[in-house]
A protein has these predicted regions:
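Divalent metal-dependent catalytic cores for phosphoryl transfer on phosphate-bearing substrates
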Residues: 8-14, 38, 47-158
Length: 158
């Protein structure tokens, strides 16, 4: 599925407030990808590929955020998605895993880096790829965020 189609589909399935956040994450992710594409192994002529991956992950990162805790757990159970004890206690953390599952099954995303960026955008993990770090950071610093601790300083560092 092309990015324009993904954007259109995502917009149909999330709230307006969530969509504004999603656009902010995609925009911020694209800007960070432009800044860090060279460090990620992309060269001048193909850095737009990395920017497109960042935009795609940004638009899809919260595609399962609208599901209730019960729905997230049910999707995981039905599709054999592993759930940790921590996730059982705080099922909202599963929106990354379920979002990656939906990205693959509903939106046709097969790029492991994009899928991992969606999976770990809330929790992070050791050894994150540059794209994973970008989505994790973009979710925190996107323009619509106003109340995160040390936000101006973190934006400056990014």
């Amino acid at each position: 599925m092309e990015l324009d189609e993904i954007i259109s589909e995502v917009k149909k399935h999330i709230t307006e407030k969530r969509y504004v956040h999603t656009e902010g994450v995609a925009f911020t992710a694209a800007a960070l990808a432009m800044k860090f594409s060279y460090e990620s192994g992309y060269r001048e002529n193909d850095n737009m590929e990395f920017v497109d991956k960042a935009r795609t992950a940004g638009y899809l990162h919260d595609n399962a955020k609208c599901l209730s805790d019960e729905e997230l757990l049910a999707v995981c159970a039905k599709n054999n998605i592993p759930v940790t004890e921590c996730e059982k206690k705080s099922p909202y953390l599963l929106h990354g895993k379920v979002g990656a599952f939906y990205a693959k099954t509903l939106y046709g995303i097969d790029d492991e880096d994009i899928l991992n960026a969606i999976t770990y955008h809330t929790t992070g993990r050791p050894g994150m790829s540059m794209l994973e770090k970008i989505i994790f950071t973009a979710d925190y610093i996107e323009p619509g965020r106003t109340r995160q601790a040390n936000l101006d300083y973190i934006r400056y560092l990014a």
